[in-house]
């Protein structure tokens, strides 16, 4: 059966750069690696084919020979110079590939100790708690070391036996085409030993599920998305590995009055038609209590008043933000006969005097000009 063109195998153009070759090879190696496709002969063949293609094309002299003579220039069975390990450098590629398979580094090292997973817990707070800070108690599901076996996974008093697959080394060597790769033993996971008499409490896992109650101190000024790291409060590691961390992620609930944007707070303040026209004074809420806000006469809907320092002091330091109050003028409803009469008198008295409604007057003038131009 004739071999496919090496450029075709990797899916690159003949003028591909070294970076292009490496990227293409890594993609194929990840896709067809035997550990991802156990028992799949077709994937194994494609993996070997990609290895062979990259081994030739990543070496300048072999690539030149292939470009000139094709497979005959590099295949010893066809009279060429052959394709041994030569100048191809697979170490950097497989460092990346196997880190994806095994969680970092080829083989993971002797002993197979692995750090426990980090945990994430979403903590909901109201706005007042987020602004002022608080201390809360949380209950988190996690994995802890099994006490009866002290995390070993073996029944107390029993002794693990040497792994027959790796002979106690913790790593195995796989032949892949023209080269071999060393990786973590799939049976003992790098331990070099297997448990023949597992602990009945954890069934040989070394860890058990448990709820952990923790006290979390929330600093003042936190906002949605902020994280609090509790070091060593994640899942227990395996085979003596370190414990992971717990990340408490803040989520601030919506407030019925205030909206927050960074260190500033916003609220809408409804005022009466008469207060807007005549001016007045009203109380508005802040997180520190009520304060008086002076409303000047002629205030329009949308007017914004700034109360300095009545916002939020950021968790990372700096002065407190402001509270911005946006006025919304309410139109009176459910009027009595006398109230209607008074408003009608007011309307009649304002008729024809544009000085009382400059925006409306300007708008109507614009409308007239618009229709006059049609």
UniProtKB/Swiss-Prot annotation:
It is found in: Cytoplasm. Binds 2 Zn(2+) ions per monomer. Zn(2+) 1 binds at residues 146, 149, 199, 202. GO terms for molecular function: ATP binding; heat shock protein binding; unfolded protein binding; zinc ion binding. Its cofactor is Zn(2+). It holds the Pfam family DnaJ_C. GO terms for biological process: chaperone cofactor-dependent protein refolding; DNA replication; protein refolding; response to heat. Transmembrane segments: none annotated. Participates actively in the response to hyperosmotic and heat shock by preventing the aggregation of stress-denatured proteins and by disaggregating proteins, also in an autonomous, DnaK-independent fashion. Unfolded proteins bind initially to DnaJ; upon interaction with the DnaJ-bound protein, DnaK hydrolyzes its bound ATP, resulting in the formation of a stable complex. GrpE releases ADP from DnaK; ATP binding to DnaK triggers the release of the substrate protein, thus completing the reaction cycle. The J domain is necessary and sufficient to stimulate DnaK ATPase activity. Zinc center 1 plays an important role in the autonomous, DnaK-independent chaperone activity of DnaJ. Zinc center 2 is essential for interaction with DnaK and for DnaJ activity. This is Chaperone protein DnaJ. It comes from Pseudomonas putida (strain ATCC 700007 / DSM 6899 / JCM 31910 / BCRC 17059 / LMG 24140 / F1).
